[in-house]
Amino acid sequence: VRVKLNRFTGVCLLAFLCCSACQKGQEPSIAWYWWKTVYAPDSAELAYFNATGAKQLGVRLFDVDTSARYPFPSPKGILQQKQAWPDSVKLVPVVYITRAALLQPGSLDSLAVRIARLVGSLMKQSNWTEIQWDHDWTGSTRANYFALLRLLKQQAIFNNKTFAATIRLHQLRQTQPGLMPPVRKGLLMVYNMGHLTQAGNTNSILDEAVWKSYQSDLKKYPLPLDWAMPVFAWAVQFRQNRFVAILNGVRAKEVLASGLVDALPNGQYRCRKAGFLAGFGVQAGDVLRLEGADAATLEKIVRILRHERNDVQPTLYFFDWQNKHIPYFSSYDIQRISQAH
């Protein structure tokens, strides 16, 4: 009996060790980004938000940018809140900072004060514990950006607030001291990773070949990470192999319904005559490249993230919450993506 018991115990122990070895990271909670300048979701958008089981909402408050008229950094596209935030949802304000704003920022101290003042004004009626800073830093802006983050931390409005910063794929390899943002956690953007303006058969929103080239860096990145995935899509318009425009929100359905295009062998479309496609002007000979991601691709990415990362209670953001994406990602799709393992 004793031998049988030991064998049984050994089998159980082996099974436990095997399960532990292949244990996946925690299932992420669902969140959405609101990126429009007016917050006024309609009943269909609100119903969809609730149906996805979202627990968090990231809201872009404003951009920090320059202009020809006013060359110093100033707020652009300030959010207008027309209705109450969803009930029982964690609210996370987001501030987007352009590269131009940090190339010649003037006084960083003054900029930090002005940003803090505006955030405080926009969020004074809301409960929030975290703020995201969105900037795609490079060697030319990193020092100013990191200095600005440190100055922002000193502003009273941000006392006891969690600072998070967006992390692009190319920044996963910058793990040396001084090359990571001075924040508590990052938000890994799994989109906008390709060469948008270059002609060719690629997908600048989510290029799986580019994504795979960074998978070995996931485990090495020391900051805790939340994750962000794309549900948006667009068509990229080229004329004589030169970039013309982004046809925002245009998918295959609109392209085919236009009656203006012929399909090419590489999955792109050539316009055979001039006209308007989903409200966008096209010329004969223009080539349209459709970009985006489907639910199956996003599921694969979540599986990889859960396998490679040990983030505690990560949040999975979807970009972005609006009606035109709902037909392509059902609430079931969103839940299935977040539960992939």
Sequence positions of predicted segments:
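Short, acidic/polar
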Residues: 38-50, 108-123, 171-176, 294-306
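Chitinase-like catalytic core of GlcNAc-active glycosidases
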Residues: 64-65, 69-182, 188
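Substrate-binding cleft of secreted/luminal carbohydrate-active enzymes
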Residues: 232, 240-341
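Bacterial Sec-dependent N-terminal signal peptides
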Residues: 1-29
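Hydrophobic faces of well-ordered beta-strands that scaffold small-molecule active sites
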Residues: 30-34, 55-59, 91-95, 131, ...
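Catalytic domains of carbohydrate-active enzymes, especially glycoside hydrolases
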Residues: 43-66, 122-126
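Substrate-binding surface in catalytic domains of secreted glycosidases
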Residues: 147-251
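Boundary/entry segment of secreted carbohydrate-active catalytic domains
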Residues: 22-49, 60
